[in-house]
Design a protein with these regions (language model features):
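Conserved beta-strand elements of the Class I
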Residues: 15-17, 152
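Extreme N-terminal starter segment of soluble prokaryotic enzymes
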Residues: 9-15
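Short acidic/histidine-rich motifs immediately flanking catalytic phosphotransfer sites
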Residues: 47-57
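Short acidic low-complexity segments
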Residues: 38-49
């Protein structure tokens, strides 16, 4: 894809949904570096006027799930986001699943078919560092990127199964796993774009184009 990179979406107002489970400063800083208006809030009632949503997560699926349930679960988040674009990052991606098996089985949002489990690999865990991914299904997050862009990962758990049509990228660490998903206007990545230098910023900038 060689088209000129579009400018950031005008008047984008980005809400970072704070589940209280990890440091989100790097996500906020990366978005602000792109010229976006960014605010962070735990109370869904104060997030209604956003144009885009970010669901970050650092830590365990169990803690993220419990924090989400305490805020009304999938129904409350569906009501908040509606048809606006949303990007899940790391554990935020894992929450798209039906359930996760970290520290017991806990419910996810059910936006993507499949569950989250420990990576079944003969390699050290967590999977930490830079790795190439292979985008599929023409996911617009990867507009204007190389065929196999490289991003920064740090995780031990991942989707164990994803319907082919909802997969947006794959990565290999001992074996192939889903590194990004798409469900309508809701997107998610297992890696950390905010820590992935220029390609990470490009991914976030692409997300800001979704009006």
């Amino acid at each position: 894809m060689s088209e000129p990179l579009p400018p950031p979406m005008p008047h984008a107002r980005i809400a970072i949904i704070d589940l209280g489970i990890g440091n989100i400063n790097s996500v906020e800083k990366a978005l602000k570096s792109l010229g976006a208006e960014v605010f962070v809030q735990q109370d869904y009632a104060l997030l209604n006027d956003a144009t885009h949503y970010i669901l970050p997560g650092v830590g365990s699926f169990a803690a993220a799930s419990q924090a989400m349930v305490a805020r009304g679960g999938a129904a409350a988040l569906n009501n908040l986001v509606g048809d606006k674009p949303l990007l899940g990052i790391c554990v935020g991606m894992q929450l798209f699943a039906r359930s996760g098996a970290e520290h017991g089985v806990n419910p996810g949002l059910g936006w993507v078919g499949g569950e989250v489990g420990l990576l079944p690999v003969p390699l050290p865990l967590p999977h930490v560092g830079w790795n190439d991914i292979t985008p599929v299904n023409d996911c617009p997050l990867f507009f204007n990127m190389p065929a196999q862009p490289c991003f920064y990962f740090t995780h031990s758990f991942a989707f164990t199964q994803v319907p082919v049509q909802q997969a947006a990228a794959y990565c290999t660490y001992g074996h192939s796993f889903v590194a990004a998903v798409q469900a309508g206007r809701r997107y998610a990545v297992q890696f950390h774009p905010e820590k992935s230098q220029q390609l990470g910023l490009l991914l976030l900038r692409n997300f800001l184009q979704f009006g």
